[in-house]
Amino acid sequence: MKFQPLGKRVLIEREEESNKTASGIIIPDNASKEKPSTGKIVEVGTECDCVKAGDKVAFAKYSGSELTLGDKKYLILNLEDVLGIIK
């Protein structure tokens, strides 16, 4: 199943956030609330010209609407909620 966002929206596959550091320290949920989320852009809307499919981006943690296609979960975000491209 395919989804094409309209206007200035993007479809993002969110990366799983780890609550444990590389050294094994567990970070409580309330300690990382202000940290932005990251994900990969899967599809871009018809009016998006500054990002493209495949870009890894940072976005506000609680932004967007969840969408399930098949067995995968995605987020639909307004382009203005994307904070930047991670290179």
Swiss-Prot record:
Annotated localization: Cytoplasm
One of the GO biological process terms: chaperone cofactor-dependent protein refolding
Record CDD domains: cpn10
Chief place of localization: cytoplasm
Pfam families associated with the record: Cpn10
GO molecular function: ATP binding; metal ion binding; protein folding chaperone; protein-folding chaperone binding; unfolded protein binding
Lineage: superkingdom: Bacteria
Gene Ontology cellular-component annotations: cytoplasm
Record's keyword annotation contains Cytoplasm: yes
Keywords, in A-Z order: Chaperone, Cytoplasm
Function: Together with the chaperonin GroEL, plays an essential role in assisting protein folding. The GroEL-GroES system forms a nano-cage that allows encapsulation of the non-native substrate proteins and provides a physical environment optimized to promote and accelerate protein folding. GroES binds to the apical surface of the GroEL ring, thereby capping the opening of the GroEL channel.
Assembly and oligomerization: Heptamer of 7 subunits arranged in a ring. Interacts with the chaperonin GroEL.
Protein family membership: Belongs to the GroES chaperonin family.
Protein name according to UniProt: Co-chaperonin GroES
Taxonomic source organism: Campylobacter hominis (strain ATCC BAA-381 / DSM 21671 / CCUG 45161 / LMG 19568 / NCTC 13146 / CH001A)
